């Protein structure tokens, strides 16, 4: 076993509180040295508390800097009322945080606003970052914080008839704390009435002087919607004048669950955030918890985690590529792709014991070591897959009909992608080579040799799918390096917060058994702090922002998923296109609704 390490031993870019980050000096030069409170955390970025009346001015300043913060990566809230470890922070009953990214600096900053329960108002950020729209709606819905000036502050995850704000600390977290649910005929009629679309509520006109618009309800059970997703189309003939995406049908309260599960027992829930990603989704969570605990895992653990993540990346990409081809009209490739995916599942099952949702990563390591014969199975897959991928490209993706349906369709540039918070292949198709595995390596990715495919400046449906093909080839390349260079050593860090003590130690020191009993029964107690980890997931950047209050459970678990941002962008991209183009566009985004709704 390796020795446990301290917080300072982790990679510098991940752990420095960035109190010396140049942006802090820039802000103080512009707004004065007393304008902010800088909060030390383990997020790896400067965390700055600003006053509500200065928020928009600060955000605009950051966006117009020579190396600007061009993307609003995340926005949400925290109920601070029960938090005990708040020394040095502004008094607050609630807070709102804004996570901004500068591509040119490859740096982030988090702005926080402290709010009193008597005055839960903050100005909307939609005039600075248009993608703040959905994030503010969800924050209002979950916490009751009003964003003054928001164009349509309404529920987004919960039914319109829902009462209360679920992420408040005084809101029940378990079904047993509610009265039994009874669906009467009257309540059913009320719920159905609430689903009726009223164009005027969204600033839409029912028609012009000469003709009426048609409103088409696509979903939430349409096969081309890729899940329980509804989108209302305002049509002039077959042309889309405008549209309104309607999400939330797959919402399961994943962030609320994080407040009622131990640090360890929450791992299975991470698999189901994006149910095709498997171990990929476990990665940011366990890395964020390891930052809180100050754990450095062995090299073997890093490499095993990378190997499992890339297997699931290939698995997800194969489904995406084949269903995209199916959406355009070709049925055969999807059946071939499932044969390939079965080989991956056989390999994953041999290693982890499970298929889609292994829940196999652990805080400080993995559940168990690699089994005998794993290398043979991986080698057979690496010999099999390249030829199959070539056949998909030759037989389907270079087909003139497919290209005619997808080239130039649903196109956007880099500026538009950044405005809407697009990440993953959609952003890289615009020519921006932002891949977290390269730009902000985690779990040893800096030790692997692979390329980041990029587009030529415009992200259209065809470019997005072809980039995924190239990403799949690079994942095969990474897997080959895992096969040939798997380090020796333990599969867990020797750390009291995560790993049972060796038997010989328990025979000498009774305290080790007491500690082990508490860890297993109540769960480990993580130091009070905040941590953050983003990763390059299958559909874009996925991240976990964890707040520990020195307890066995997370005080606040914020899950930022790429698909949420990507669906918000749909109206801006598809206006003026045909309904048939929308179907191809939806197929090119690569999303599942569990990733959107959490």
UniProtKB/Swiss-Prot annotation:
Domain of life: Bacteria
Protein localization: Cell inner membrane
Gene3D superfamilies assigned to the protein according to its UniProt record, in alphabetical order: Cytochrome-c3 Hydrogenase, chain B (1.10.645.10), NADH:ubiquinone oxidoreductase, 30kDa subunit (3.30.460.80)
Recorded topology in the membrane: Peripheral membrane protein
Keywords for this protein: Cell inner membrane, Cell membrane, Membrane, Multifunctional enzyme, NAD, Quinone, Translocase, Transport, Ubiquinone
One term under GO cellular component: plasma membrane
KW Translocase (keyword) present: yes
Region NADH dehydrogenase I subunit C, annotated ranges: 1-188
Region NADH dehydrogenase I subunit D, residue ranges: 212-598
Catalyzed reactions: a quinone + NADH + 5 H(+)(in) = a quinol + NAD(+) + 4 H(+)(out)
GO molecular function, a single term: quinone binding
EC code: 7.1.1.-
Matching PROSITE patterns: COMPLEX1_49K
HAMAP family: NDH1_NuoC, NDH1_NuoCD_1, NDH1_NuoD
Family annotation (PANTHER family): NADH-QUINONE OXIDOREDUCTASE SUBUNIT C_D, NADH-UBIQUINONE OXIDOREDUCTASE 49 KDA SUBUNIT
Subunit structure: NDH-1 is composed of 13 different subunits. Subunits NuoB, CD, E, F, and G constitute the peripheral sector of the complex.
Function: NDH-1 shuttles electrons from NADH, via FMN and iron-sulfur (Fe-S) centers, to quinones in the respiratory chain. The immediate electron acceptor for the enzyme in this species is believed to be ubiquinone. Couples the redox reaction to proton translocation (for every two electrons transferred, four hydrogen ions are translocated across the cytoplasmic membrane), and thus conserves the redox energy in a proton gradient.
Family listed: In the N-terminal section; belongs to the complex I 30 kDa subunit family.
Protein name, as recorded: NADH-quinone oxidoreductase subunit C/D
